[in-house]
Amino acid sequence: MPFFYKTPSGADLLNTQTPGAYKQADLLVTSKIIPEGGSSSQVINLAVQEITIMNDAASGYSYFVGELPTEVHRHIIETYVRLSPTLTDTLTYEFRSPDVVSKIYYNKGLVWDIANLKQNQWMPIIVVR
């Protein structure tokens, strides 16, 4: 799932040329999950090993792909996106079934809804800071 970060004026916060942009080395995505066959007392943290910032040719904005562990064998509780050493955001979820996410909330604001998906296309998460 692609994550885009912009300022209210539209500046790209993942572009190194933007003042105050987030640094690739600081980015970390970690999800709290319950493993297959586990219970709520067996929560583990699963981190994306490497975040790569890429450029979206269509929009001209930079983004990174945050892999969300929503496979059948895991139940995702919430995800933390560290943007800098002093700034970490939280994603929470609603599920249509145990393994299908229907809504994603970013710091409690709805940012993704399966009802708005176009066929065969992932909807990006766009965060304005």
PLM feature spans:
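N-terminal export/targeting and maturation segments
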Residues: 1-33
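Extracytoplasmic cysteine-anchoring/structural motifs
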Residues: 4, 30, 34-129
